[in-house]
Curated annotation (Swiss-Prot):
Name this protein carries in UniProt: Large ribosomal subunit protein bL27
InterPro entries reported for this sequence: Ribosomal_bL27, Ribosomal_bL27_CS
Keyword terms of this UniProt record: Ribonucleoprotein, Ribosomal protein
Chain spans, region Disordered: 1-21
HAMAP family in alphabetical order: Ribosomal_bL27
Homology family: Belongs to the bacterial ribosomal protein bL27 family.
Gene Ontology biological process terms from the UniProt entry: translation
One Gene Ontology CC term in the entry: cytosolic large ribosomal subunit
Superkingdom in the source lineage: Bacteria
Keyword Disulfide bond: no
GO MF, any single term: structural constituent of ribosome
Amino acid sequence: MAHKKGQGSTQNNRDSAGRRLGVKKFGGEFVRAGNIIIRQRGTKVHPGNNVGLGKDHTIYALIDGYVKFEIKDKQRKKVSVYPIENN
């Protein structure tokens, strides 16, 4: 029999790094085509005008312009990009 207690080990002491999700460009901010506006899991926010939806549900700008968050209907939000108005 061992006269010293064996080395213990921890089993549940692991964690994964955060995924850096969320809004990257806020309402009223200027974006260039290709800029990521939101990284999300699922379509918490739906794509509106002049934005694309990536296969991981990332919303990105298709044109240069200003970001605008809008209400699509009672349960849904959408984000759009509107071009700069030339006066």
